[in-house]
């Protein structure tokens, strides 16, 4: 147990989610619990991970989730390990939720040099309906940038995907290659623009971000056969697009071959995506979590053959393998499934709550009584009461005298 690698999970703690503050101590090695000396709360070592409060051995859960990431049918896992389908589904849901948080924290942090991005969508068969799953990738590093699942292939689906691409981008100057879907042009034009502040009243005008290149590969079919391919330059020039393709080594013309190859990887890893298969997905949330689980394993745990580099002289092996996350500079080693699923996601920094009302009078500081030229001196309380009673007596006596005179 390493307390220096842990952080406080208490949402009300001022030191929540912060590493290196030396506020974590070992509370119980037998129960694997830590304690925060800032707030005094204890928490388990598996808190905020898929293994939290599970009764089954961690090794068994890792094996089952690894098989699910490699396209193993659910019924095969049930027959091999004697588990219930609902148990496996619950583990998959936990791991998918953790994978989505992990992806948003490590990939969508604006640290990736994209260079060349490709996006595409594919349909998934479900119970009584089908879903559309749109995904994007950074071609030079083969990094999966994220995906969105929706029942409709519309502008909302593509806009959400494009927003994820912008969150991951470190520089806004890169090339985007997509298919002929018109929603891509509208989504990239809306998302990749910034307000131009002129100092005048009113909402500032939104201007397109310079440096973004967009090309479309439009395929014309006749029946089930591809008869013609049209390459269209939407943003930028053909010379600029060719220069980016040559610099990144990702082709000589506008293409979507890399994202289509990634689609094939996901089809082999997600059982419901197999063509002409019998497996179907039961809900949009299940597919989203499963997609993020496979995507995180692809980025951080799986070596990519096209990313290997020559090993330094003197090493036993000729090549050094890399994962997409290593090629993108997000990590320096290949993660295991245990590391991926055991990595908790830190909470955002604690912010002191704002007081929305005045303090009670017993907690307020006494305020000085303001003086004026007409009343320069404020009498003490007793003197004020005496003066008030004297003025009242004078007023009553004058009223009596006036009544007697009348």
Residue ranges and their predicted role:
Residues 1-406:
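Residue-level recognition of single "structural anchor" positions
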